[in-house]
Amino acid sequence: IIESIRAGLVFALKDAVGVDTIHELESGFLARAMKEWGDHPAIQILGSPTAERLSTVSFVVTSPSGRYLHHNVVVAILNDLFGIQVRGGCSCAGPYGHRLLGIDLERSQEFEREIASGCEGIKPGWARVSFNYFISEAVFRYLVDAVSLIADQGYKLVPHYRFSPDTGLWRHESGIVEPPVRLNQMRFDDGGSLTFPRRDDHAPESALADYLAEARALFDSLPDPHAGGEARHVADERLSEDFEHLRWFDLPATSLER
């Protein structure tokens, strides 16, 4: 019943705002983001640049090495450095993903064999960002600038992340961040009300510019891992020859989980 009420409220809100208004706002955000990211030399937007689409942009980021940044490390950096949550993967669109990424049948079968052996991390994919009609101009600029900044210098942070070949997940070297609230911290009081530790810290939108400035300063302070012609390949007994043959993303030696 509760989920039906929530669904009804969603549709009521949509009708109150108006489909035309939603479409106009989202189309405006989408066109501006597509133009800016489309002009960036390290961002490849997937799909037709002219076909009508929803306000979701799927993209991959190239590295100075000639490879790509793994989509999940892009997702991790956006989350950890900017507090932006996006999704990475192939959007449950395997055959279409093959077309978008130019993977032929032979290559697909090679990926399938490696994934079936337990190496989920080799699976190709992309990151995707959505622009909802209700975001402000400041939030829109923050999203666009954060992705552009990662495309500019995100590769510098990759050595500070640990990659799991089994899952394809990347975690910062400092370890897993504790969640704000755990299930075992939630209680029902004597009156039957749910209680839990509250953390209601909120920053104004004016802080977003400061976050971008701090991120730029961090990137500028990091050494370039590709300076001096460092080797692109990783020699590690846990990675098969097939994995190395298929590897399409940067994987510094420091990034392998121990």
For each predicted feature, which ranges?
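Non-catalytic terminal extensions of PLP-dependent enzymes
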Residues: I2, K14-L25, F29-G47, L54-R258
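PLP-dependent aminotransferase class I/II
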Residues: I1-L9
